[in-house]
Amino acid sequence: MTEVLILDIISIMAKKHPSTQAFSQAEVTKKYGIPKSVIHKYFPREQMRSIRARSGRRLSFPVWTDEQIQQLVRRSDIAKAIEQTRNDQAAERQRREAEALFASYSPDALIQRARTLDRAFVLHVGPTNSGKTYGALEDLKQHTPGCYLAPLRLLALEMFDKLNDAGVPCSMVTGEESILIPGADNISSTIELCDYTRRFKTAVIDEAQLIADPERGAAWLKAICLVNAEVVHVCMAPEALTYLERLVRAFDAPYTVQKHERLCPLTFSGSVHGYEDLQKDDAIICFSRKSVLSTAAHLERNGFRASVIYGALPPEARRNEVRKYLAGETNIVVATDAIGMGISLPIRRVIFAETEKFDGKEFRSLNTAEINQIGGRAGRYGMHEKGEVLVLGKDTAIGDKLGNQVRAIRAGCISFPREALRTDIPLSILLKVWQAMPRRSDFVREDMREPLSLLR
C-alpha cells in the first residue's frame, strides 16, 4: 500500500510539473495530496520564497521542487505518515457521515417527519380478547383504502382472509410471501413491510406494546410515526397507553382513547395431571415447532384429534388446520405462543404444557405480559361462560402471574438502521458511531456491542 502511494505521488509530479518548479506548502497539499501535518513535521525548510504583501511587508515561506518531494516521499517514515494521515482523514470523514446518517433515523427526526403528516389517531386499549382489533378492523372495512400491520405472518394472513371474506379486496405481503389480489387497494402485512409510499384512509397497527421489544420495537415506532393514513388505529395492551399517548402528543395530532374490557371472565383453574385430563376446545401451548408436532402426535395416538398452529406454518396448511377445528374435525389445538397474537379460535381452556421459552439468547420463565397475552386467548364471549388457564404439572408460577398488572412501558426501541449497511462506510465505523450515540430515557438504542466485539 505504501509503495503504491509513493508511485502515485511521483506519477502526478512527472505528468504535470517540471523538475525545477518549486511549490509552496499549500501547492504541495493541493497538487499532490500530501497532508499539511506531514509537511510540517517532515519536510525541511531550506529553500525560501519571498513575496511582497499589499501592506508592503515582505513575506517568506518554504518551497520545494518536485525532485525534493520525490526524494522525501520515498523515505519510509514519511510515506507511512502520509498513508496513516490519509487513513485517519478518511475515517473521520466516514465517522461524520455515519453520525449524519444515524441522526436522520433518530427519534427527533421521526417525530419531525410525523408532524408533517395530516393524521388523527384512535388508541384502542385493552387486554387480550377484549375486541380492540375488531373495532379497528370494522372501521377499515368502511373506509378504504386501508392497511393492517401485524406482528406475525399468521395474523397478517388471518386478517387477509377476514377482509376478503367480508367483501373487502385485500392483498397480503410478508417476509415469506406475497398474495396480490387483482384490483385490491387494501393490504395486510407484517409491520416491517409497511408501505410508506402510499396514502391510506385507514391504518390499523396491532399489538403496539411491542414498541418496547428490543429486537423488533423499532418497526412499531416507525409505523406509528410515519404510516400515512387519515385515521390511524393503534391497538395495544394497557401497559403501553401512557407511553404511546405521550408519543402521539409529540406529533401535534388529534387523538382519542377507546378502552376495551374483556366480556368473558378469565380464571386460573390449577393443573391438569396428564393428557387424559384434556377436554374439547383445549389449547395446549408449547414453545417450539418440534414440541408442537410431537405433542400433537402423542394426542393422536391417544384418541384426540389435534390441529397445530405455529409461526412457520405455510398459509394453506394454517387455513386447513383452522378449518378442521372450526368444522369439528379436530377438537384440540396444539400451538406455540403465536396463538397469543390474535389468532382467533373458540378456545375454552389454555393449558401451558411448558412454562419456559427460548427468547433467542437463553431459556427463561414466561413473564407476566406473555402469560396474560397467551392465557387471554381462553374464553369466547357468547360461547363460553368463562375462559380458563391451566398448567400441565405442578408449576404454580402461571397462576401467580396471570392477571397481574404489567409494568408500564417507559421507552420505545430504535433498531440499528439496516440501510446503513448499503453505504460505503466500513461496518466497524458504523457500529462504533452507533454505540456512541447520545442516550435517551424514552428511547432505547439497539445494543450492537456483540457484533462490534466480533470485529475486534
Cite the ranges covered by each PLM segment.
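Inter-Walker segment of RecA-like/P-loop motor cores
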Residues: 163-197
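Conserved segment of the helicase C-terminal RecA-like domain
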Residues: 367-406
